[in-house]
Regions:
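Zn-dependent metallo-beta-lactamase
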Residues: 1-25, 30, 35
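Conserved strand-to-helix beginnings and helix N-cap segments that scaffold or border functional pockets
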Residues: 16, 61-65, 194
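Amide-donor transfer/coupling interface in amidating biosynthetic enzymes
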Residues: 2-13, 39-40, 45, 71-73, ...
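Conserved active-site segments centered on acidic
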Residues: 94-101
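Active-site metal-binding loops of divalent metal-dependent hydrolases
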Residues: 54-55, 89, 187
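Flexible gly/pro-rich beta->alpha loop and the following alpha-helix that scaffold active-site loops
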Residues: 21-83, 96
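Gly/Ala-rich beta-loop-alpha elbow adjacent to hydrolase catalytic centers
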Residues: 84, 88, 93
């Protein structure tokens, strides 16, 4: 059972509708929680967490009561695998000591991404061909996460080939080895990247 942690209903920004459908396509069981629920943290069938996209903006160094639900489940499930998507990746970056670079305009659309050989992308055949590491992915964000240089355990695993400043920037991370990951793009947003979600689930179940 995957636990999806969000206070939102589906909308164009969080892509929850697409996330739910992608999981249903593989008959992956999931539970959605929209509040800090003491009953859920007692459950023994929760195998992993997904923190999906959100419509509101995450702020780097400003307390936000809206983030209480994410931190609640991260605290109470300290050893569970976690996948943060867009907003979820931003939350994890702050949780693990990184920061966010804020922009006034939205970064939205399909852009090229270089994928590493990380197991999250295992078995993936990129759009540019089997011998390429490059894929197109769907983005929708204002704040770009930046890994803390003082914490080498936070590892970059994918990169936007050309961001708004014309440079290459990390857009996916491994925060805790073989357990906690974040991607700034929406893998549920395009069929070509659905297998990232499936790889996350398959790895969880293979370790049960």
């Amino acid at each position: 059972m995957l636990l999806i942690v969000t206070r939102e209903i589906p909308n164009h920004a969080n892509k929850l509708r697409e996330l739910f459908q992608t999981l249903k396509d593989r008959d992956i069981p999931y539970l959605v929680t929209r509040r800090c629920d003491p009953a859920i943290i007692q459950r023994t069938d929760i195998r992993g967490l997904i923190i999906p996209g959100a419509r509101f903006r995450t702020k780097s160094h400003t307390p936000q009561s809206e983030l209480m639900i994410e931190f609640y489940y991260l605290y109470h499930f300290p050893k569970k695998p976690v996948l943060g998507i867009c907003h979820g990746c931003q939350v994890l970056m702050l949780y693990y000591g990184g920061s966010l670079v804020s922009y006034n305009t939205l970064w939205k659309g399909e852009y090229d991404v270089d994928l590493s050989k990380h197991h999250l992308f295992k078995g993936h055949t990129p759009a540019h061909g089997r011998n390429s590491s490059r894929e197109q992915a769907y983005f929708y964000f204002h704040e770009l996460p930046v890994a803390p240089p003082s914490i080498p355990s936070v590892r970059e695993i994918a990169w936007i080939t050309k961001f708004r400043d014309g440079r290459r920037h990390a857009c996916a991370f491994e925060f805790a080895k073989n357990r906690v990951y974040g991607v700034m793009f929406h893998p549920e947003g395009m069929p070509a990247t659905h297998d990232i979600l499936y790889n996350f689930y398959d790895k969880i179940m293979s370790s049960v």
